[in-house]
A protein has these predicted regions:
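PP2C/PPM-type serine/threonine phosphatase catalytic domain
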Residues: 1-253
Length: 253
């Protein structure tokens, strides 16, 4: 059975933790959401998204006659369709809550969510929360940031040296609840024995770079509780400007 552990920390600068995460081995579901919005609305958005995603994934795993509100996408696997529908349901719920309650206006959340079935991992993402893979001591980012700097980098407007300190580095171009509909990035990868997968908010990768993350995770064989604690400690020691959340999964060797 896959090994998993999650940890979150408010960081050094914030008073409220607006990140939420889920570790559910029973549903083979793992997720990180990084909420945004004033008056604690980000905390509401991230929790609402996690709860909505979990509810649909759990139901779709056991109910044969479940309703698919937007139908099924023939280009996606069953798990891909489950994640796509779950996040779209979360988007609708967060958007409606923000529209109905003045104190929640403008709230939203990033999401990175994964289902592990056998040797396959399916990942859905929106925003700048990330999924990484450590295999053979090598770190690889499996998701693409939905952010202004990522788009500018892809279009050649910026180079990689500009990104780390760019004033728009925290501006995301996609979030759950920001609009009445959402397009998701969904990818699928085959896992190998001993692979380590990490889901994280930008409170981690925005404070320490990939080289430092790779150094801390090493070969990916350290106890997950220890590795997550070291990652969060490093983010906080680098300034801790944001909430930081890490979920680690390890495929049995």
């Amino acid at each position: 059975m896959i090994e998993a552990f999650g940890r979150t920390d408010v960081g050094r600068r914030r008073k409220i933790n607006e990140d939420s995460f889920l570790v559910s081995p029973e549903a083979s579901l793992y997720a990180v959401c990084d909420g945004m919005g004033g008056h604690n609305a980000g905390e509401v958005a991230s929790k609402m998204a996690i709860e909505t995603i979990a509810a649909f994934i759990e139901r779709s795993g056991v109910e044969k006659e479940i309703t698919w509100p937007w139908g099924l996408d023939a280009n996606l696997s069953f798990d891909g369709n489950r994640l796509k529908t779950a996040v779209r349901l979360a988007n609708a719920k967060v958007f409606q809550a923000a529209d109905n309650r003045e104190e929640l206006t403008g709230m939203g959340t990033t999401v990175v969510a994964s289902i592990v079935t056998g040797k396959s991992i399916t990942i859905a993402s929106a925003g700048d929360s990330r999924c990484y893979l450590v295999r053979g001591g090598e770190l690889k980012q499996l998701t693409r940031d939905d952010s202004w700097v990522s788009a500018a980098l892809g279009e050649g407007i910026l180079n990689s040296d500009d990104v780390e300190h760019h004033p728009l580095r925290n501006v995301i171009t996609k979030a759950v609840g920001a609009r009445d509909s959402i397009d998701l990035d969904i990818v699928q990868h085959e896992l190998q024995p001993g692979d380590l997968v990490m889901l994280c908010s930008d409170g981690l990768h925005g404070m320490i770079n990939d080289q430092e993350i790779s150094r801390i995770l090493g070969a990916g064989d350290a106890p997950l509780e220890d590795a997550s604690a070291r990652l969060i400690e490093a983010a906080n020691e680098s300034g801790g400007r944001d909430n930081v959340t890490v979920v680690l999964l390890r495929q049995p060797a």
